[in-house]
Amino acid sequence: MKILVTGGAGFIGSAVVRHIINNTQDSVINVDKLTYAGNLESLTEIENNERYKFEHADICDSVAIANIFAHHQPDAIMHLAAESHVDRSITGPADFIETNIVGTYILLEEARKYWLALSEDRKGAFRFHHISTDEVYGDLPHPDEVSSDTILPLFTEQTSYSPSSPYSASKASSDHLVRAWRRTYGLPTIVTNCSNNYGPYHFPEKLIPLIILNAIAGKLLPVYGNGEQIRDWLYVEDHARALYEVVTKGVPGETYNIGGHNERKNIDVVKTICRILDELIADKPDGIENFEQLIRYVSDRPGHDLRYAIDASKIKQDLGWVPQETFETGITKTIHWYLNNKEWWQRVMDGSYAGERLGLVE
């Protein structure tokens, strides 16, 4: 099977590419624009594999995408290319509209044209797998808002959309486009919505890598608002396994939620990282006895969702997928990776981002 992966140099995309090349006999065509968050160094372990090809292209370039389809003749598309940071979407929403909505439209149209020209056998086996986020659903009641005997709801595949940020609104729009191309044109599409990912090769604008790297450097650890917001955490390699199961075994027209079964308050995530670093690093930065001393509460993100939590029972029942990592095992692996891969993240931090606060509304 030949799988075209968009955004394969990004955090989740590179995990998908590594999983396919390392654990299957399938081939990958990685199509990536290489924005600030795209990093081919995340793929050095597989870059010379004969089953891996890279195409430097923008999904908004219809001519380039059509040529790539014609040249490589993929059997499936896994669409991960996206602008994905909520804070950046607050200060610069235009890139999110362009890439996440217009780019998805162009990819759908070129995929539809390509698919229509395939033989009947190949047409029947073709898949367009759109990878999205649980943020399209909005937020859920927080345990502090309800009585202790209340059963807290989870996001299911039937949950209505109610996006809160420019990022989540752009992803919701792309989800609707994908489903429209399925219903209107018959394109065999599948949608997945995942919870918060973490793990190796994560660009340090996101909470977990930012906290790890700030702590190592002895910098303050910013926590938005009161830190009580709750997220479900999914180890990225578990997610990559799930996505491969979906593209190879999933049913066209279906949606699958993918979660880690690891609800944690943001402040508890930060304190867990501090505790593990305390155990691993004997020589602390000057002036501190433990890393929790670096925690500082800062102004909250505008429109910050209170709680995300996913019901992943459908993908377990239909495809047999369950996460292998608990939050404790996954976060320990993640911290060890950052401690042992200083060259990777130092080169990232020497580029366009140095850990500054993003997403403030003037």
From Swiss-Prot:
GO terms for biological process: nucleotide-sugar metabolic process; O antigen biosynthetic process. Keywords: Carbohydrate metabolism, Lipopolysaccharide biosynthesis, Lyase, NAD. Binds 1 NAD(+) per subunit. Its EC number is 4.2.1.46. Substrate binds at residues 84, 133, 196, 206-207, 222-224, 231, 266, 300-304. It catalyses: dTDP-alpha-D-glucose = dTDP-4-dehydro-6-deoxy-alpha-D-glucose + H2O. GO terms for molecular function: dTDP-glucose 4,6-dehydratase activity. Pathway: Bacterial outer membrane biogenesis; LPS O-antigen biosynthesis. It holds the Pfam family GDP_Man_Dehyd. NAD(+) binds at residues 11-12, 32-35, 58-59, 80-84, 99, 167-171, 197. Gene3D superfamilies: NAD(P)-binding Rossmann-like Domain, UDP-galactose 4-epimerase, domain 1. The active site is at 134 (proton donor), 135 (proton acceptor), 167 (proton acceptor). Its cofactor is NAD(+). InterPro entries: dTDP_Gluc_deHydtase (IPR005888), NAD(P)-bd_dom (IPR016040), NAD(P)-bd_dom_sf (IPR036291). NCBIfam families: dTDP_gluc_dehyt (TIGR01181), PRK10084.1 (NF007490). Catalyzes the dehydration of dTDP-D-glucose to form dTDP-4-dehydro-6-deoxy-D-glucose via a three-step process involving oxidation, dehydration and reduction. This reaction is a step in the biosynthesis of D-fucofuranose, a component of E.coli O52 O antigen. Belongs to the NAD(P)-dependent epimerase/dehydratase family. dTDP-glucose dehydratase subfamily. This is dTDP-glucose 4,6-dehydratase. The gene is rmlB.
